[in-house]
Design a protein with these regions (language model features):
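Long, contiguous binding/interaction regions
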Residues: 1-90
């Protein structure tokens, strides 16, 4: 079974969103779906708004749609989008 390295971009609803709390919620969703978060970063967007970027590894057969949907359903999230997906080698 192949594994995928996935990058997801999470846009908070506003600049008032606690990004640390949001990051923990997103990591819990990814872990619950069988993923392992490796890298986390913040990307400035505009006017103080920052996007949360998480890179994680997941089994290829699971897919990313359930993760994207669950993250998008969070109250403090405007959108969640997979921005990169690659097969892991080795």
């Amino acid at each position: 079974m192949a594994r995928m390295v996935v990058s997801i971009k999470v846009m908070p609803d506003s600049i008032e969103v606690d990004l640390e709390s949001l990051k923990q919620k997103v990591k819990e969703i990814i872990s619950a779906e069988g993923g392992e978060v490796g890298k986390e970063s913040l990307e400035p967007v505009a006017f103080g708004l920052k996007a949360l970027i998480l890179v994680f590894v997941i089994n290829e057969d699971k897919g990313t749609d359930p993760i994207e949907n669950k993250i998008s359903e969070l109250e403090e999230v405007s959108s969640a989008q997979v921005i990169d997906m690659r097969r892991a080698m080795g």
